[in-house]
Amino acid sequence: MANIKSAIKRAKTSEKRRAHNASMKSAMRTAIKKFEALVELKDVEKAQEAFIIASKKLDKAASKGLIHKNAASRQKSRLAKKLNSIQAS
């Protein structure tokens, strides 16, 4: 454990940020999984809503630095491709 006051504060702050980041990432992954489950069921209406939510979560994570902006873009592209495939059929 740190002895210096500023190091103690940094350790506390770091732990809080870690917990917050973990919950944000978890929410992002959950939104993606919900979307993919709806794609499996071929529920176009709900899948469109879930796609919007998942896209927002990905954008938010990218803007906060949780994931790289190109990684978010790639994920959104793949989700959009899945959505388009069920809309076409």
Swiss-Prot record:
The keyword Ribonucleoprotein applies. Residues 1-25, 69-89 are annotated as: Disordered. One of its GO terms (cellular component) is small ribosomal subunit. Residues 7-20 have a biased composition (Basic residues). One of its GO terms (molecular function) is small ribosomal subunit rRNA binding. Gene3D superfamilies: Ribosomal protein S20. It holds the Pfam family Ribosomal_S20p. InterPro entries: Ribosomal_bS20, Ribosomal_bS20_sf. Keywords: Ribonucleoprotein, Ribosomal protein, RNA-binding, rRNA-binding. One of its GO terms (biological process) is translation. It comes from the Bacteria. Belongs to the bacterial ribosomal protein bS20 family. NCBIfam families: S20. Binds directly to 16S ribosomal RNA. This is Small ribosomal subunit protein bS20. It comes from Geobacillus thermodenitrificans (strain NG80-2).
